[in-house]
Amino acid sequence: MIIVSSCLAGMKVRYNGTDCLEQGIRQLLDSRQAVAVCPELLGGFSTPREPAEIIGGNGRDVLEGRARVVDRAGNDVTAMYIEGAYAALEQAHSLAARLVVLKENSPSCGSSWIYNGEFAGGKIPGEGVTTALLRLHGIEVISEEELAARLPELEG
């Protein structure tokens, strides 16, 4: 089974109430090879919500207590991001997920890039909280940007 970010599956769960539908993800869902999950909703957030970014590091730093996740209003929402990451990990284990495709740049789901914590659109290399936790547990995580190259293998 493959787990995919709910926003990539066309669900309007992003912080601003939109989606980021990826056609390849839709194909995986339609063929019942994938299940959609949103770590932020699993962590207790609603839609819409304030955008949030990691301050002082990356997702692994958040898990190890060296960085935090803060929303644009200045609220520390670290605990909710960690809770959502653990809920996503539980789902990955219960589904025996072999691959997880998450939304790049997100403080939860980024796999190569995250926003830099300045709320101005700047990005830095790094991974989000959920991606870091899944990888620490040996689960492969890729972004939607890497999916096209993997689709033939996944659909075969």
Language-model segments: residues:
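Extreme N-terminal starter segment of soluble prokaryotic enzymes
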Residues: 1-3
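Active-site loop/lid in soluble adenylation, ligation, and acyl-transfer enzymes
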Residues: 5-18
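Short, well-ordered beta-to-alpha junction loops that form the rim of enzyme active sites
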Residues: 7, 103-106, 146
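Short catalytic/ligand-binding loop motif for oxyanion handling, primarily in non-cytosolic enzymes
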Residues: 12, 46, 108-111
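Divalent-metal-activated hydrolytic enzyme cores
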Residues: 12-15, 23, 42, 60-87, ...
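Short, surface-exposed acidic-centric catalytic microdomains
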Residues: 20-70
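Glycine-rich phosphate-binding loop signature in dinucleotide/nucleotide-binding domains
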Residues: 93-96
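Internal, conserved structured core segments that host functional sites
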Residues: 99-114, 118
